[in-house]
């Protein structure tokens, strides 16, 4: 095909897909219909439109500046960044991060390993879940890791009860937030965790109804990792399994697809599950499983560039556990 024709086709496709801020009212009406949104008053609708327009301007700016990722109008488009973070994340940072999980300092240079690794390809990662309007990302990331540990050890899937962890973990704060290593500690203290089918998710704080006779996974030891070298997460991922990590979710809210090169860290506020890494067009990236449903991002997943501390991924909070 003629190179000029090919360029015009590609350029035209990109232009057709691009947003125009002048069309914000049309996009907003489409958004209301698609996501079945309604508001209590016209003044509230106007306020939400103003937030929507601000988010649209950010999306347009990101799509212009980030050549390897795309951003879109999604279900969070009428929420301010602060609203999204307060309602749909849930990592809570106390003054004291110590507990009886063993602390491991990853201060040695990374080993030479494969350029690509993905636990999904080995069929060891359970389906994407949706935490809803409950700050329980910490519970989902922690149990997502245990679900993968179970799959690695027993070669079968099981979905564990985030609701049990929300209701029965008295160190963390349920839908008001928690941490990864303290959640592993809570599972150890409880003696185990039930299946989601026995203790279904309700997306709110409730009374503890744990039944020890129905525990399906028990934790024998937990770890918290201090990462000096970001690349060392590769070794950890391959040897341990999918790893719950802490990030700043502010820049991923309107993510659609691709490798994010720009993801700031203004403060850790969200927990996700690191499941793999790879290289695309010379850009190395991490693969992370989110808990905002399969209709967000790349079927519930997102990718960020490695070795730039994207979203603050290099920190003292990655955690894991061994199961019986």
Curated annotation (Swiss-Prot):
The active site is at 137, 270, 290. InterPro entries: Papain-like_cys_pep_sf, Pept_asp_AS, Pept_cys_AS, Pept_his_AS, Peptidase_C1A, Peptidase_C1A_C, Peptidase_C1A_papain-like, Prot_inhib_I29. It catalyses: Endopeptidase of broad specificity, hydrolyzing substrates of both cathepsin L and cathepsin B. Synthesized as an inactive proenzyme and activated by proteolytic removal of the inhibitory propeptide. Glycans are attached at residue 159. It comes from the Viruses. SUPFAM superfamilies: Cysteine proteinases. Keywords: Disulfide bond, Glycoprotein, Hydrolase, Protease, Signal, Thiol protease, Zymogen. Residues 1-16 form the signal peptide. Its EC number is 3.4.22.50. It holds the Pfam family Peptidase_C1. GO terms for biological process: proteolysis. One of its GO terms (molecular function) is cysteine-type peptidase activity. CDD domains: Peptidase_C1A (cd02248). Disulfide bonds join 134-175, 168-208, 263-311. Residues 17-113 form a propeptide. The keyword Hydrolase applies. PANTHER family: CYSTEINE PROTEASE FAMILY C1-RELATED. Belongs to the peptidase C1 family. Cysteine protease that plays an essential role in host liquefaction to facilitate horizontal transmission of the virus. May participate in the degradation of foreign protein expressed by the baculovirus system. This is Viral cathepsin.
